[in-house]
Regions:
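Enzymes that bind and transform nitrogen-containing heteroaromatic metabolites
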Residues: 1-219
Length: 219
């Protein structure tokens, strides 16, 4: 990949180099949203973000996963993208759900690498669960109890919005896809939140027609 700036424009970097970040000491875990969008604003085709990506995007995703302690994902995204166990040994995927209506025989949960994140009043589940909040998942409490330094978030829109509304997001790792969504668009972030919060561009790189950008919270 070729860096575009604002630091070291024109230099070459691979996905692992781009994903390697110095993070300042932080009392709470670092929460980083990873998402993809197109020139016409689509974030999904027929409910899935996978078709918008390609080999460069997949390698970048794997690089971000290699540098996190846990993956956090909404139940709808996990179902739509048919999540399986992560390829990295020891990495676990925490699925956020209020209803616990999940396929616990799926490869993700059968592998023992899937965790359910839900409310204290949700039904019992046959796998490991982390619970906080009554009626609504208390994401701040959940993230604090995961024992993770870096939480890598893979959507969907409702989870992204909830994390932003709770002021829990430290960085956004955004892929710009060269594909167009047309009528099959989706929102990267669903519901309104305080738009006064600002993120600053700290790095960007290009691989083919894909552009990767990292924004960090301005505090």
């Amino acid at each position: 990949m070729q860096r575009l700036g604002p630091l070291h424009p024109g230099t070459l970097v691979d996905a692992d180099g781009f994903a390697t970040r110095e993070r300042a000491p932080h009392a709470a875990p670092h929460v980083e949203i990873c998402m993809i969008t197109t020139p016409d604003g689509a974030t999904a085709l027929d409910g899935r973000s996978g078709p918008l990506g390609g080999p460069p995007d997949q390698e970048m995703l794997r690089a971000w996963r290699r540098r996190c302690d846990i993956v956090l994902v909404g139940a709808g995204t996990a179902r739509a993208e048919n999540y399986g166990p992560p390829s990295r040994e020891g990495l676990r995927i925490a699925v956020v759900t209020r209803t616990c209506n999940l396929d616990y025989s799926s490869p993700l949960f059968a592998s023992g690498r899937g965790i359910v994140v839900t409310t204290t009043d949700a039904p019992d589940v046959p796998v490991e669960s982390v619970r906080a909040g009554f009626g609504e998942v208390d994401l701040a409490a959940i993230i604090g109890s995961l024992g993770a330094r870096v939480v890598h978030v893979e959507g969907g829109p409702a989870l992204n919005a909830s994390l932003l509304a709770a002021d829990l997001v430290d960085a956004i790792n955004l892929t710009f896809s060269p594909r167009l969504g047309g009528a099959h668009t989706g929102d990267a972030i669903a519901t309104a939140f305080d738009g006064s919060r600002r993120f600053v561009l700290v790095d960007a790189a290009r691989e083919g027609d894909f552009v990767f950008a990292r924004y960090e919270r301005s505090r």
